[in-house]
């Protein structure tokens, strides 16, 4: 079983990693090709393209200039320790043991606009490039065209090694990022957990809580060494519980009545 996550815009390069083991991104050459094209943009063009402030555009202009094809512990950090958004607060990889991270390395993947597909311990240099960015490039009109079927083929290569009930892709990514995967071409069952909170008299998806819950689900999979979709239904972190009446074979709905 493989669980896929979205990346985070917020990054942490201040906290030293608690493990030294690291790996190299599979699509580093593709990332380098994108960086070459991004370096042609001025800070003003970056601000317009990404709808970000001028200071943030200047920061990323410098990030692209500093980016190196060679990722080392001196200029990069393990992806799961560098990402710092809501999902990663739920995952809390900094508190995972080396054995947990080793399991995550085999069962967790992060979709990325720049790197395509990352393992948790792949070295990540600072960047900002959301998958939904309409960045025209040598391969097409946007990043979905750039990545094409590459991400799907990479996932299939890994899923091919799984057998039976473990040949499952658990989609804990956002719609923006999962659009880079071609489910019809996947040689696996896709299960999507959905997290809803009770608010204003009904259950609804609340973005902040749902993002955190995706990270909590990934942590549950890692710590519990979960390798079958049925075991996902026992997830009960921070008050969530599986609701069979709202779920089906492809979508597992987890609900809670109060905040964490």
Swiss-Prot record:
One of its GO terms (biological process) is response to hydroperoxide. Coiled coil: none annotated. Signal peptide: none annotated. InterPro entries: YaaA (IPR005583). GO terms for cellular component: cytosol. PANTHER family: PEROXIDE STRESS RESISTANCE PROTEIN YAAA, PEROXIDE STRESS RESPONSE PROTEIN YAAA. Belongs to the UPF0246 family. HAMAP family: UPF0246. This is UPF0246 protein BPSL1241.
